[in-house]
């Protein structure tokens, strides 16, 4: 049986109204399972939606996302309703990629396995788990933390903070005033 990934909506603040009536943007939570997961998140050409493509079936909670044409590995989510993304990739060798035009903050947490995690265009938090990870903040003032394993951390343009893990990591800040802690 194919495992599905749960897409859940988490409110930024406790709102006394049902989600369907909420005027405040929410954070979109994406949680991976123990298998190898792949997520690609992009802003659509018209800028009105986020397109999420996965290597496994996606289940959706709430009413801000829907499957286009009943494709279980793809979602479209209303962009103005989303204040940020939080991705917990789970176990396995995972790949999480946000395109650089994503204008909202992104938090990505890698699990066990050799992960490739790419932030978007805003100020992002990228955290590696156990394994030899590739962690990229890309644009914005990013905070990147390596975990156990030989990680490569790259901040990209912006004032980034990079902190290596307990093993021999490679850190590269990119253009900007960066803080590198091996």
Positions of the model-derived regions?
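Extracellular lectin-like interaction modules
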Residues: 22-102, 106, 115
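Generic detector of solvent-exposed, compositionally biased contiguous segments
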Residues: 76-80, 120, 129
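Short cationic/low-complexity microdomains
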Residues: 71, 152-170
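Intrinsic low-complexity/IDR segments
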Residues: 18, 179-181
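Short hydrophobic transmembrane-like helices used for membrane targeting/insertion
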Residues: 17, 126-127, 144
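Glycine-centered beta-turn/loop sites at beta-strand termini
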Residues: 32, 88-89, 98, 108-110, ...
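Secretory targeting and sorting signals
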Residues: 1-22
């Amino acid at each position: 049986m194919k495992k599905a990934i749960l897409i859940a909506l988490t409110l930024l603040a406790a709102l006394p109204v049902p989600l369907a009536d909420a005027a405040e943007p929410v954070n979109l939570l994406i949680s991976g399972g123990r298998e190898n997961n792949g997520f690609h998140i992009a802003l659509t050409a018209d800028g009105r939606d986020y397109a999420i493509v996965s290597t496994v079936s996606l289940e959706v909670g709430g009413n801000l996302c829907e499957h286009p044409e009943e494709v279980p590995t793809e979602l479209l989510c209303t962009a103005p309703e989303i204040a940020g993304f939080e991705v917990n990739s789970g176990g396995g060798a995972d790949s999480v990629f946000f395109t650089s035009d994503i204008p909202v903050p992104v938090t990505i947490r890698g699990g066990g396995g050799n992960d490739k995690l790419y932030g978007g265009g805003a100020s992002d938090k990228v955290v590696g788990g156990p394994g030899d990870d590739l962690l990229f903040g890309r644009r914005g003032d990013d905070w990147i933390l390596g975990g156990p394993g030989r990680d490569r951390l790259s901040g990209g343009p912006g004032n980034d903070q990079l902190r290596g893990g307990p093993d021999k990591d490679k850190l590269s800040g990119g253009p900007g005033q960066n803080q590198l802690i091996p």
